[in-house]
A protein has these predicted regions:
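HotDog/MaoC-like acyl-thioester-processing domains
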Residues: 1-38
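Anion-binding alpha/beta catalytic cores of soluble intermediary-metabolism enzymes, centered on
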Residues: 39-85, 89-187
Length: 187
């Protein structure tokens, strides 16, 4: 027996021994549970509608070396939300895109060696006014934040904050969470 996940990767492999009953077994028919299919995109249409008429913002995407980061970039670009600049090891970014069938045509890439360098270059782009926002890719949050709050980063005399959107299928609305791991004890 082989069981695979949604990406076709083997997660369990082994042998199953089936012991068939010697006598016929009858079981009462059970009522199946109700199945609900959620349209995840529909949950965000009201937020996307509020962006209509706004210009796409220049976005520095830091170390997008995984499928999710690249798909997010492409979808946000196609929706007219961002004009991305990918910052990271170009060969690795292009390899992931090719393996996942993601088209990066027309998207700028700044080739840097590793995630620390990507964070530093992305922060510099914002500081120089060449990007208006940062998007975290496949690097640790502390790598990005150490550049953001560093002496040559983006910090000011004001408090820094952030927000992330959690898609909770059992909650009827998008859930916005602020200050996770940034302001651990806000007043």
């Amino acid at each position: 027996c082989v069981c695979t996940n949604q990406d076709g990767q083997t997660v369990i492999r082994g042998t199953a021994e089936v012991l068939a009953p010697t006598e016929k077994i009858k079981r009462a028919r059970i009522e199946l549970p109700e199945v609900t299919l959620l349209d995840r995109e529909a949950r965000y249409q009201h937020l996307l509608a509020r962006t209509k008429g706004l210009a796409a913002i220049p976005m520095a995407v830091v170390h997008p070396c995984d499928r999710e980061s690249l798909l997010g970039v492409v979808e946000a670009t196609q929706a007219g939300l961002i004009v991305p600049t990918l910052i990271g090891p170009e060969a690795k970014i292009r390899s992931v895109a090719e393996q996942q069938g993601i088209d990066l045509a027309g998207i700028a890439i700044i080739d840097v060696e590793h995630s620390h360098a990507a964070a530093a270059r992305a922060v510099a782009l914002v500081r120089e006014g060449k990007a208006e926002a940062l998007m975290k890719g496949s690097l640790h949050t502390d790598e990005l934040m150490s550049e953001v709050v560093g002496i040559n980063g983006l910090r000011t005399a004001r408090r820094i904050s952030h927000v992330f959107l959690a898609d909770v299928p059992t909650y009827p609305k998008p859930l916005l969470i602020t200050d996770a791991a940034i302001n651990v004890a806000p007043d």
